[in-house]
Amino acid sequence: MIRTENLCKKYEKVEAVKDLSISVEPGEIYGFLGPNGAGKTTTIMMILGILKPTSGKILVFNKDLYSDYFGIKRRVGVVSEVQYLYEDMTAYEYLSFFCDIYNVKNKKEKIEELLHKVDLYDRKDDLLGHYSRGMQQKIGFVRALLNDPELLILDEPVSGLDPTGIREVRDLILEENQRGRTVFMSSHILSEVERISHRVGIMNKGRLVAEDTMENLRKKLSSEVEIELEVDNFDVEAEKRLESLSFVNSVIKEDGKYLVRVKADKDYRGDLVNFVSAIGGNLKEIRKREMSLEDAFITITEKNISLFSSGEVSE
């Protein structure tokens, strides 16, 4: 759906994007991440055709972006971080204006259908300048869907929204993906990206340093796993014996529970259950704590790690 090949962008002496090759597959939600200054915005602007790359190729729908630029644009919907709306227009007038630009047939039915989808039909005759930030973001989504795009490119789609607004936008993204649309999404709210993305790509210092599923990122980055134990009849001597187990790296007592860090070479929960039983403890709960996307992101960017397809970790 989107593929870049050795993409580079230089500004005089600054190389903002270096040899970038990413692949977004049809039908997936792809989370595009990176710290400030990593090159994400520059990359998105090149994919949208706003910036021309210094070198490299951009393929969208298996076509070179510049070989059929306007044909490709007609198949793409874009939602930016800030909606630059015509605030002296009503929502209906604004969407009708874009329907005319896109040559949308049955525009009245299309506008009403999409406004119902985002629960703004009853506000269709209100001026956009009177809309809240969340409502304006929804109108941005509606505008992006008017031309029935195959690909949605979302740049910080939930930035500045309250929890309700974030949930509504998340549900909208998932619904559109289930309808068959591919989604390429940049966001700083990592919990949202983790919740809905099939794969993520992480940029750092202008380069792509990771591109994989969360499950595979965990496998590549985790040298240890955290297991939370809640247990009764567990005295100081039992704690010492737990710490001395060959597969245990450390034990921390936290809010009446034990956070046990073990090696990541196998699932040691069964061994811990057997240990607690053998010493006469009463196990109330055992839970494995998975590495979050935030954990992976911080590990990769702060330690300047690059992950390769072989699973090799390079610092």
Residue ranges and their predicted role:
Residues L65, V104, D232-F234, D265, ...:
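Short beta->alpha junction loops/turns
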Residues G77, N103, D119, G140, ...:
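A generic structural signal for secondary-structure junctions
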